[in-house]
Amino acid sequence: MNDTLQHGPIVVLAGGLSHEREVSLRSGRRVSQALRDQGREVVESDLNASLIELLRGLNNPVVFPMLHGGVGEDGGLQQVLNLLDVAYVGSSAAAARRSFNKAIGGPLAAQAGLATPNAVALPHDMFRELGAAALVASLGERIGFPMIVKPARSGSALGCSKVDAAAELPAAMVGAYGYGDVAVVEEFIDGTEVAVAVVELDGEVVALPAVEIQPNSAIYDYTARYTAGETRFIVPAGLSDPVAKACADLAISAHQVLGLRDLSRADIIVRPDGTPVFIESNSAPGMTETSLFPQAVEAAGWDFGLLCAQLVDNAWARHLG
């Protein structure tokens, strides 16, 4: 590749105004340092009014989005970057939107034949107009207890709760609606929780070793995710080879069904009989010190910084067409 076709600075974009701002900043700092360790020129930027001017002032920039939640994962950022004709790492706007919205991604996965929990998406207006009492009874019959209640459009398990009885459901719904106007109520799957990172390199989609998650709390919530010592991680997960392969295949299938690109992380629960159930895929997985994706990279024997650099190079090559 000659000089005129080489990319310029890598703009690691982190922060934003979502509920996950602090996690995003931590992810951004880690990716920035990893890329600098590879000798790459990095510019760190928040999502603010000066971003477009910054991108226009750089020669052939490549954006590495580390925004979590909101415009970073719902396709909004990708649409702007397409408008500016700027290369970026990660999924397209449409694919990011599909995976971020659990009311869309879950049904798509189920329609494609992937094992998923029984689930219902309920807009806040519907919950309010029809009345909590009637809906609570119907949800109990359809989904059963215990159940999981979470916002349709949020990450890091914000607004997510486990509901063991009907009396707890209204408060859980209110908690989920605090993060968006649609809540997803889904069957609680009892089993081993694992995360499987997926990367695309040289046209090949690869699943990295599964990370087993053992939180101190009842569910893998925000505190368990980002507080050191609150969760035990087993890497690679303590799964038999056939079950580990089934999890890897499921993660890759979800990546492809949702049309994701470059990298993703599938959240999976393995039932006691060894059957993996797909919960959701994240198109912009966290990269903090306690995040699952970097742990999987390390377990695979890969260099995290080199992988980040390869993802940038792939994004630039794709941009050139």
Please identify what each model-predicted range represents.
Residues 1-107, 123-135, 314-321:
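ATP-binding N-terminal substructure of ATP-dependent carboxylate-amine bond-forming enzymes
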Residues 2-8, 111, 240-321:
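ATP-dependent carboxylate activation and anion-phosphoryl transfer catalytic cores
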Residues 7-13, 227-236, 292:
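A short small-residue
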Residues 75-82, 220-227, 283:
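Short, flexible, mixed-charge acidic loops at enzyme active sites
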Residues 164-249, 270, 275-277:
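Phosphate-binding site of ATP-dependent enzymes
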